[in-house]
Design a protein with these regions (language model features):
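Conserved ABC ATPase "signature" region
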Residues: 119-137
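Conserved ABC ATPase signature
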Residues: 141-145, 149
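Catalytic Walker B motif of ABC-type/P-loop ATPase nucleotide-binding domains
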Residues: 166-169
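Conserved catalytic motifs of ABC-family nucleotide-binding domains
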Residues: 162
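Conserved ABC transporter NBD signature motif
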Residues: 61-73
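Single conserved hydrophobic/aromatic residue that forms the stacking wall/gate
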Residues: 216-224
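H-loop/switch region of ABC-family ATPase nucleotide-binding domains
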Residues: 202-203
């Protein structure tokens, strides 16, 4: 039996002075699975992604009850930066996560912040860009890349840290159907090659049917 890497138990969450965004969530993600979470707009899927990485509630604030466990430990009292070394996150608003001028600097940013040696940073950056189909783009300015390429760049920055889990919130929102299929083929190849646990929030489930192990759907907002 596969072990759990993420578990939400009786989890409720509301942003400050707002109604409940997540209500009575019980969810278990197995190690090495490729899991899809689907549901309508307003169902709390983005907030769920943030809860899986400790951003909600411990970075953004809000009211909550219940528990979230990541890799066998509760997120309570853990630093978001420590969780980020093991759980990568790509949000739908990917532009807000891009912080550098060039593709190489973007991939290297979190590695340098975590104290990796320059030689290892350079090698991980090269390999991550190659893995996402952007080989040799280290010196490219971000404004030279298309929206889809910038989403691939953010995936490269996530992969470079070698996370055990990757959580992706609508990662193909800036892509045409061909680009979306290509990115999900890439994600599945990474999942197969490295055994990475993949969790994708996506309203177009048809993109993912060839790859998914587990599918969770939400019929109405906040009823996850």
């Amino acid at each position: 039996m596969m072990e759990s890497v993420i578990r939400l138990e009786n989890f409720y969450f509301a942003y400050n002075k707002s109604e409940l965004v997540l209500q009575d969530i019980d969810l278990e993600i197995k190690k090495g699975s490729f899991t899809v979470v689907a549901g309508p707009s307003g169902a709390g899927k983005t907030t769920l992604c943030k809860a899986m990485t400790g951003i909600v509630p411990f970075y953004m604030g809000g009211r909550y009850s219940g528990d979230v466990q990541v890799l066998g430990e509760s997120t309570k009292g853990r630093r978001v930066s420590d969780i980020a070394m093991r759980v990568g996150l790509m949000l739908e608003d990917y532009e807000s996560q891009l912080v550098s001028l060039t593709a190489g600097e973007e991939v290297a940013f979190s590695l340098l912040n975590h104290g990796f040696a320059p030689e290892e940073v350079a090698e991980r950056t090269r390999k991550a860009l190659e893995d996402v189909g952007l080989p040799g783009r280290e010196s490219y300015q971000l404004d030279e890349l298309s929206g889809g390429q910038r989403q691939r760049l953010l995936l490269a920055a996530t992969l470079a840290v070698h996370p055990e889990i990757i959580v992706l919130d609508e990662p193909v929102s800036a892509m045409d159907p061909d680009g979306a299929h290509s990115l999900y083929e890439l994600l599945y190849a990474i999942h197969q090659r490295y055994g990475t646990t993949i969790i994708v929030v996506e309203h177009r489930v048809d993109y993912l049917l060839p790859y998914v192990c587990l599918l969770y759907t939400s019929p109405s907002p906040r009823d996850m």
